[in-house]
RNA sequence: GCCCCGGUCGUCUAGCCCGGUCAAGGAUAUCGGCCUCUCGAGCCGAAGAUCCCGGGUUCAAAUCCCGGCCGGGGCACCA
């Protein structure tokens, strides 16, 4: 045994010394020894002493003899390969207990379309339920506020579309405004068991009780009284604001907002009708109540949501406790700030109202529809979300990162086209007989996609203004000498290797007679840049939605005739 | 102010739960080279991290414990 350890120590001491300029470190060698011979941990102190001796010996040797001894005894120790890591999120706690039947949900308020911020919970919840576990993914519309965050009738469908595009199809769908009776029933049970009560104090009075950490006088009334009040709430005898149903928690809870939080309130739906149910209901559950009840009723096992919901989890646990239900596992992830993109719902909405943004898919915005219009692929959003993962700390991700992921997917798909941006130069061609024919490569990585033929008779082309050399290569057409300050191009040959050898700039061009005018729209912070120019004739045939690369310019998505939206470099 | 939660290359992240194969791996951005009919892609290389700071436990701490600092979230009859 002793001998074995000494040998192992010698091996790692040598390897360590060779790796770090002749001096091995005791700590590192000890670690390696334990890794190779885990049993040795039991006699850790002795091993350390032994390693110290060995390291001393090794360090007194010359680097050359260390290396030669190592390669003689353990040649394999010289190759330092590393483990490869697989990109995958950590498993979910509590997934075993449910036998891998993980049920998650995505629960948006249908008051707006989805944006990059909402993509995170959508993808994460979908990923765990459907990709990592063999479970169920639920879509639930949380539209229980007809007053402050009024649902937008179109939003239900817009969100469904957004999710389908994102690649997170759902197994079941629920709309909270259609489930009011469910919430009423649980409310009644809680009142009867003395765990909820109707309070008729004003908002200010309730706040005062909370701040003081004192119980609400209403809470001392018997359940029968509260049942009566509850009936009166439902029958419309209390005007808006006159009564609320509160959940008993702890009047002195360290977090004042948890103290007997409000589960239902009266809303005047004649004044502010709900887009789906009109004025049918006047008593509305709050987010925390509806959410708690639904998560249980729908069998949700895991809730993944942002850290802004941390206190809500705390509140909702009281409903579970009172009802004797088992709460789902909650995981809170941190904020994801996307630098250089407008994400906030309220800012977007205000911007659209003020005319700052044209619409919900204005290319400067971070809505999923805007990203799609810009040519961002859902796969790229997935990569971004999965990379950021479920860490609780705030992540400041850059648009560059999103673009890098997107480029990975877009690059092979996007065929190459030529587009000459303004200011373009017109040059006449000498030395080629009309009709002139060029063959441009459709995609350099995929020769099987072939070449595109451009034929024209009038010997004039548009050139990008950055052509300043005495010779230039026009892609697919030939090498030229630049004469008369760039107004003339004299044909030399069509040999790519000539261009390489003489280091000619290789540029895009467009025939003047059949070029297609176009403009590229580019989101630049709060502005939209417009780059107009001339494209090769086949641009006219590209269908809207097609994503291509404008050579030497960047990737674009075809918006419509003559309009292209810049995706990224 | 009160209540939570965090802190690893510029940025994002792996490792942390269960201390040792980590003098810290990957990605992105940057810089160089090769390759390419693009300023795209690919390949190779460089540089980049006092693992927030201080203390403690231990043979051994990015990992466990305590304190500090800094950052974030919440404090609605919104979701």
From Swiss-Prot:
Keywords: Aminoacyl-tRNA synthetase, ATP-binding, Cytoplasm, Ligase, Nucleotide-binding, Protein biosynthesis. GO terms for molecular function: ATP binding; glutamate-tRNA ligase activity. GO terms for biological process: amide biosynthetic process; glutamyl-tRNA aminoacylation. Belongs to the class-I aminoacyl-tRNA synthetase family. Glutamate--tRNA ligase type 2 subfamily. Its EC number is 6.1.1.17. Catalyzes the attachment of glutamate to tRNA(Glu) in a two-step reaction: glutamate is first activated by ATP to form Glu-AMP and then transferred to the acceptor end of tRNA(Glu). PANTHER family: GLUTAMATE--TRNA LIGASE, GLUTAMINE-TRNA LIGASE. Pfam families: tRNA-synt_1c, tRNA-synt_1c_C, tRNA-synt_1c_C2. InterPro entries: Gln/Glu-tRNA_Ligase, Glu-tRNA-synth_arc/euk, Glu/Gln-tRNA-synth, Glu/Gln-tRNA-synth_Ib_cat-dom, Glu/Gln-tRNA-synth_Ib_codon-bd, Rbsml_bL25/Gln-tRNA_synth_N, Ribosomal_bL25/Gln-tRNA_synth, Rossmann-like_a/b/a_fold. CDD domains: GluRS_non_core. The keyword Nucleotide-binding applies. HAMAP family: Glu_tRNA_synth_type2 (MF_02076). One of its GO terms (cellular component) is cytosol. It catalyses: tRNA(Glu) + L-glutamate + ATP = L-glutamyl-tRNA(Glu) + AMP + diphosphate. The gene is gltX. This is Glutamate--tRNA ligase. It is an enzyme of class 6 (ligase). It comes from the Archaea. A motif ('HIGH' region) lies at residues 108-118. It is found in: Cytoplasm. Its main location: cytoplasm.
């Amino acid at each position: 045994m002793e001998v074995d350890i000494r040998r192992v120590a010698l091996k790692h001491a040598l390897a360590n010394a060779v790796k770090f300029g002749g001096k091995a470190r005791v700590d590192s060698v000890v670690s390696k020894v334990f890794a190779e011979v885990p049993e040795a941990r039991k006699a850790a102190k002795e091993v350390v002493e032994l390693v110290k001796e060995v390291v001393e010996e090794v360090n007194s040797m010359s680097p050359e003899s260390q290396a030669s001894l190592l390669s003689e005894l353990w040649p394999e120790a010289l190759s330092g390969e590393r483990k490869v890591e697989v990109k995958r999120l950590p498993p979910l706690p509590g997934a075993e207990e449910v036998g891998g039947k993980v049920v998650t949900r995505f629960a948006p308020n249908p008051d707006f379309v989805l944006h990059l911020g909402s993509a995170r919970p959508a993808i994460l919840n979908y990923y765990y339920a459907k990709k990592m576990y063999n479970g169920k993914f639920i879509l639930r519309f949380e539209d229980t506020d007809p007053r402050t965050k009024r649902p937008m009738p179109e939003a239900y469908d817009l969100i469904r579309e957004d999710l389908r595009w994102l690649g997170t199809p759902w197994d079941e769908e629920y709309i909270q405004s259609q489930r009011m009776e469910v919430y009423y029933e649980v409310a009644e049970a809680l009142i009867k068991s003395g765990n909820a009560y109707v309070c008729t104090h004003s908002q200010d009075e309730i706040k005062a009780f909370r701040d003081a950490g004192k119980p609400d006088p209403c809470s001392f009334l018997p359940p029968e009284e509260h049942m009566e009040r509850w009936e009166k709430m439902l029958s419309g005898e209390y005007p808006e604001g006159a009564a609320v149903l509160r959940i008993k928690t702890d009047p002195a809870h360290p977090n004042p907002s948890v103290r007997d939080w409000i589960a239902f309130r009266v809303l005047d739906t004649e004044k502010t009708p709900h887009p789906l149910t009109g004025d049918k209901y006047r008593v509305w559950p709050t987010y925390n109540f509806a959410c708690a009840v639904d998560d249980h009723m729908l069998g949700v096992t895991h809730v993944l949501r942002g850290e802004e919901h941390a206190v809500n989890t705390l509140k909702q646990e009281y409903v579970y406790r009172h009802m004797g239900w088992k709460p789902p596992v909650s995981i809170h992830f941190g904020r994801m700030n996307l630098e250089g993109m407008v994400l906030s719902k309220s800012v977007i909405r205000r911007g659209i109202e003020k005319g700052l943004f044209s619409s919900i898919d204005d290319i400067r915005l971070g809505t999923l529809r805007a990203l799609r219009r810009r040519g961002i692929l859902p796969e790229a959003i997935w990569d971004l979300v999965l990379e950021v993962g479920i860490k609780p700390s705030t992540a400041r991700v850059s648009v560059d990162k999103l673009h890098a992921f997107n480029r990975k997917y877009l690059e092979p798909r996007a065929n190459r086209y030529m587009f000459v941006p303004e200011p373009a130069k017109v040059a006449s061609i000498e030395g080629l007989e009309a009709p002139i024919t060029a063959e441009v490569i459709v995609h350099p990585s995929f020769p099987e996609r072939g070449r595109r033929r451009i034929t024209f008779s009038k010997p004039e082309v548009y050139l990008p203004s950055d052509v300043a050399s005495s010779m230039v290569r026009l892609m697919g057409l030939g090498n030229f000498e630049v004469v008369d300050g760039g107004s003339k191009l004299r044909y030399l040959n069509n040999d790519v290797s000539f261009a390489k050898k003489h280091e000619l700039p290789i540029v895009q061009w467009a025939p003047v007679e059949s070029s297609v005018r176009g403009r590229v729209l580019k989101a630049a912070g709060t502005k939209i840049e417009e780059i107009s120019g001339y494209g090769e004739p086949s641009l006219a045939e590209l269908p809207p939605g097609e994503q291509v690369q404008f050579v030497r310019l960047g990737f674009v998505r075809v918006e419509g005739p003559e309009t292209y939206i810049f995706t990224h470099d």
